Amino acid sequence: MIAHIQGKLVEKSPTEVVIDCNGVGYHVNISLHTYGLLPTTDFVKLFTHLIIKEDSHSLYGFAEKSEKEIFKLLISVSGIGANIARTMLSSIEPKQIINAIGSGDVGTIQSIKGIGVKTAQRTIIDLKEKVLKLYDLDQVSISQSNTNKDEALSALEVLGFIRKSAEKVVEKIVATMPDATVETIIKQALKNL
């Protein structure tokens, strides 16, 4: 219904912004990912998705069209509402969500606050085929990079690093070097931990 909004950025916080569009202030819910991509100038354009319920109209905004499309996929899953989808996009990068769904990585999806095992599994079951087709992902390369990532995380845990902090570093490495070997991931992680 409302494809995008552009105007003057009046207020911003990590979860919402107010955009003045010709004298009307629109309250738009955003993810942390979008918050990080907001321009430093006063003028902003967000791609939006309007959710109309019996008791409310909620507008969700995204800095990138791709994030909006992922949001729409996520809310199509039974048990995932707009707020949980926004939490998912705030917790991990949109590309990581796509890779986790495409590779069937229940652990990554489940690591998001508010997502249990059943919801993570349902998300993968409902969206895996769509994600593989829409994003033209090669299932073999995804599972290979996930295996390397998991092996590297296990090795870092054995070396005494806390899993959460190691996970963040390893995710960044895998995002920049998707074909990295286990050894390369560990070496790069040791430099950053």
Curated annotation (Swiss-Prot):
Residues 145-193 are annotated as: Domain III. Its main location: cytoplasm. Residues 1-63 are annotated as: Domain I. Residues 64-142 are annotated as: Domain II. One of its GO terms (biological process) is DNA repair. It is found in: Cytoplasm. InterPro entries: DNA_helicase_Holl-junc_RuvA_I (IPR013849), NA-bd_OB-fold (IPR012340), RuvA (IPR000085), RuvA_2-like (IPR010994), RuvA_C (IPR011114), RuvA_C_sf (IPR036267). Gene3D superfamilies: 5' to 3' exonuclease, C-terminal subdomain, DNA helicase RuvA subunit, C-terminal domain, Nucleic acid-binding proteins. It comes from the Bacteria. The keyword Cytoplasm applies. It holds the Pfam family RuvA_C. The keyword DNA-binding applies. GO terms for cellular component: cytoplasm; Holliday junction helicase complex; Holliday junction resolvase complex. Keywords: Cytoplasm, DNA damage, DNA recombination, DNA repair, DNA-binding. GO terms for molecular function: ATP binding; four-way junction DNA binding; four-way junction helicase activity. Residues 143-145 are annotated as: Flexible linker. Signal peptide: none annotated. Belongs to the RuvA family. The RuvA-RuvB-RuvC complex processes Holliday junction (HJ) DNA during genetic recombination and DNA repair, while the RuvA-RuvB complex plays an important role in the rescue of blocked DNA replication forks via replication fork reversal (RFR). RuvA specifically binds to HJ cruciform DNA, conferring on it an open structure. The RuvB hexamer acts as an ATP-dependent pump, pulling dsDNA into and through the RuvAB complex. HJ branch migration allows RuvC to scan DNA until it finds its consensus sequence, where it cleaves and resolves the cruciform DNA. Has three domains with a flexible linker between the domains II and III and assumes an 'L' shape. Domain III is highly mobile and contacts RuvB. Homotetramer. Forms an RuvA(8)-RuvB(12)-Holliday junction (HJ) complex. HJ DNA is sandwiched between 2 RuvA tetramers; dsDNA enters through RuvA and exits via RuvB. An RuvB hexamer assembles on each DNA strand where it exits the tetramer. Each RuvB hexamer is contacted by two RuvA subunits (via domain III) on 2 adjacent RuvB subunits; this complex drives branch migration. In the full resolvosome a probable DNA-RuvA(4)-RuvB(12)-RuvC(2) complex forms which resolves the HJ. This is Holliday junction branch migration complex subunit RuvA. It comes from Flavobacterium psychrophilum (strain ATCC 49511 / DSM 21280 / CIP 103535 / JIP02/86).
